[in-house]
């Protein structure tokens, strides 16, 4: 029988399983940062705002595919195994990445260009729908007793490494290439780099071992049974979706949308926006395992409640302070404050979500809740934030969207743990 990774091999297991997360976030961040260049290449329009909104709409379309991927691929992983499923998601994600990198512009192939970019995003979204769930469940099942929050936090921590690497590459391009060169062809270079690392990630994932928890399961549910169980637990899925809303909205605001927000709304330089994003990625990387470890010690609920309340009280004031006199220092401080919210909350939230899902549908349940939240909240954050600024004329208006997500997180935490306290669903760890 395949053995669960030993303590000595834990780091290697975490590295192998989170490598796909790295690729996913690397591509998503690039799409957000180079949105203005992608808009000009694939969506020519008289209005820069219209072209940018079309680009963010395509970006968001990938998130609409996530729930479908969560159900289809999540059911496969729960039935066949974690390792095999994660290999398939990586292959699909790689195809989407390659397509976006290679598609000629609108001037070359006309309407086919935006259509192919859309297909690439849909493929990425389909695979990403289960990537986070599959990785989170894998990490939770290899975690040592009392450390599940710390282990699962590395799912998101790996994404922060991708953000830092992508931002460093972008900064290098801005230093070595001119604006016209980046606009015409330079923005594609990071996407090609993403394509080049796909074979390495395949090699890493091939050496993954199946988790002992999955191998010991005597019952392997069929697809119909999985869907029936999900339907019976729709309240848990709904609460889980709202629970994720806080983390996914904050994350996509401080990473994917921030570079565009800094350049087009606050009129900061591209280099300043990239440096801020790098600092945010590093900050996220630090706070995520801290949040997970603290939740292992004091419970998930105190961390989740405390952070959502803090976000509700402080978000609008700090956004007003930023937009009153926007500069590099203020933007850095505000986004690092939001980074603290994200890291602490997400560190506890991922572990909590794996614990409340019924064991036989843990991957599909987690992935569906996460994907719905990402589609409704996170994926649309750039478009909604852009629209809020355009419609209201208030540069701080995206703060209202962040507060809405925090309110969802607070409500979900209250509802979910009230049900757990009443015995609605048993869990495996201290909540």
Curated annotation (Swiss-Prot):
Membrane side Periplasmic: residue ranges: 47-51, 106-108, 183, 257-273, 323-332, 385-397
Documented effect of changing residue 418 to V: In transposon Tn3411
Gene3D superfamilies: MFS general substrate transporter like domains (1.20.1250.20)
One term of GO molecular function: symporter activity
Impact reported for residue 427 to A: In transposon Tn3411
Biological process, per Gene Ontology: citrate metabolic process
Cytoplasmic topological domain: 1-25, 73-84, 130-161, 205-235, 295-301, 354-363, 419-431
InterPro entries, A to Z: H+-coupled_symporters, MFS, MFS_dom, MFS_trans_sf, MHS_symport, Sugar_transporter_CS
Keywords of the record: Cell inner membrane, Cell membrane, Citrate utilization, Membrane, Plasmid, Symport, Transmembrane, Transmembrane helix, Transport, Transposable element
Comment field (misc): Allows the utilization of citrate as a sole source of carbon and energy.
Protein name from the UniProt record: Citrate-proton symporter
Organism: Escherichia coli
Lineage: Bacteria, Pseudomonadati, Pseudomonadota, Gammaproteobacteria, Enterobacterales
């Amino acid at each position: 029988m395949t053995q669960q990774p030993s303590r000595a091999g834990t780091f290697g297991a975490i590295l192998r399983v989170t490598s796909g997360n790295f690729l996913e976030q690397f591509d998503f961040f690039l799409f957000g940062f180079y949105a203005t260049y992608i808009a000009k290449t694939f969506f020519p329009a008289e209005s820069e705002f219209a072209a940018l909104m079309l680009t963010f709409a395509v970006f968001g379309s990938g998130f609409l595919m996530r729930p479908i991927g969560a159900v289809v691929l999540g059911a496969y992983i729960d039935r066949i195994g974690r390792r095999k499923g994660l290999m398939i998601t990586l292959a699909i994600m790689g195809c989407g990445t390659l397509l976006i990198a290679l598609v000629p512009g609108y001037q070359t192939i006309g309407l086919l260009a935006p259509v192919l970019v859309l297909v690439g995003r849909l493929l990425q979204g389909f695979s990403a729908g289960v990537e986070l769930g599959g990785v989170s469940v894998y990490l939770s099942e290899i975690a040592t007793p009392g450390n599940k929050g710390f282990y699962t936090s590395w799912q998101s921590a790996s994404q922060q490494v991708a953000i830092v690497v992508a931002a460093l590459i972008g900064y290098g391009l801005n230093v070595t290439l001119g604006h016209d060169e980046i606009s015409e062809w330079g923005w594609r270079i990071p996407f090609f780099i993403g394509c080049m690392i796909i074979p390495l990630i395949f090699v890493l994932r091939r050496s993954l071992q199946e988790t002992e928890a999955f191998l010991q399961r005597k019952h392997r549910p069929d697809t119909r049974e999985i869907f029936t169980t999900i339907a019976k637990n729709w309240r848990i899925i709904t609460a889980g979706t709202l629970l994720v809303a806080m983390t996914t909205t904050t994350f996509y605001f401080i990473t994917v949308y921030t570079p565009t927000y800094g350049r087009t709304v606050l009129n900061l330089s591209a280099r300043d926006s990239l440096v801020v994003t790098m600092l945010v990625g590093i900050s996220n990387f630090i706070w995520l395992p801290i949040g997970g470890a603290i939740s292992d010690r004091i419970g998930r609920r105190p961390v989740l409640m405390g952070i959502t309340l803090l976000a509700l009280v402080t978000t609008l004031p700090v956004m007003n302070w930023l937009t009153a006199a926007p500069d590099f220092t203020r933007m850095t401080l505000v986004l690092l404050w939001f980074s603290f919210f994200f890291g602490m909350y997400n560190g506890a939230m991922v572990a909590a979500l794996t614990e409340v899902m019924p064991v036989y549908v843990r991957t599909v349940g987690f992935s569906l809740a996460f994907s719905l939240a990402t589609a409704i909240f996170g994926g649309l954050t750039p478009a909604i934030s852009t629209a809020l600024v355009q419609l209201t004329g208030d540069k701080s208006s995206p703060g209202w969207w962040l507060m809405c997500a925090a309110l969802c997180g607070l409500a979900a935490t209250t509802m979910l743990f009230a049900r757990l306290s009443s015995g609605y669903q048993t869990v495996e760890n201290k909540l």
